[in-house]
Amino acid sequence: MPDLPDPTLYAIPFFIITVAIEFFASRYRDHIRYDVKDMATSLTLGTGSVFAGILTGGIAVAAAFFVYEYRIFDVPLTAWWAWILVFFVDDFFYYIFHRGAHRIRWVWAAHVNHHSSEYYNLGTALRQPWTSTFALTWIFSLPMFWLGFHPAMVAFAGGINLLYQYWIHTEAIDKMPRWFEAVMNTPSHHRVHHATNPRYLDKNYAGIFIIWDRMFGTFEPETSKETIQYGIIKNLKSYNILWAVFHEWIGMAKDLWSAPWRYKLNYLIKPPGWSHDGSRDSSESIRAKWLEEKERNRHSELASGSRAANNDGEAEPRSA
């Protein structure tokens, strides 16, 4: 097995230094926002995620090598083109995973940890889940091993992907050059992803390359006309670590217990917010209501403008 390092472990000192720099900068820059308790929660979740990975990651590793034994190709570890290829392929499957994590409640129950902060800063990037293995997030990578990518190769590419995503968790950077914004994931694009504003819900799933969102219709640009609200639809309003980690699992268990038998599975695999009686709001229903209201307001403005024009015409004095 090739001995490849874990890039995220080597980056820990960099994480600590840059979070500290941004935290102190927030005292002098209004657009950079930090809360001490929120930051402590994020860092605790990040630390716990490392230990959770050590304790449970063996399941994902075993599954990876099992699938790799039945690979249909052999991607050489020593070929330069193989490393370029693995970064693109890994990022594509990351997009699939990330989209699934927002559309399948079972997977969302783990991923929600990352979105539960009402702040958006470098500390938020370290707010990672503890239950990823249990949520089966590793399943989304299995096709790569079947295609012939060595598990160590995929793990290294995944680490680089996470490292890239670290710097985009900030409000300190507005926009990158236009060409960069067109191809790469950026702070602007990822702010949209973390927003709870109806126009931004379930958008911009990219890891490194924003091209996947552009290709598959999930891209939404950031607009300066609307202030971004961060967090989740029903924010935690708590800094309790265990509640932050398990609140969605608890909610899902309650729904599973009380739901009619014919709907129980749906509470696991349908999107967050789905309910069998339509009593809750999903991202689709929230966005649909927003679009309806937006359309009503547009018609109202047009009608008001038309009435104003008619009144102005009637008020014009007649010539002698």
Regions found by a protein language model. Give the residues of each.
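Loop-to-helix transition at the N-terminal end of transmembrane alpha-helices
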Residues: 10, 33-50, 79
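Cytosolic/stromal cytosol-facing helical appendages immediately following the last transmembrane segment
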Residues: 119-124, 170-319
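Membrane-interface helix-loop junction between the first two transmembrane segments
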Residues: 20-40
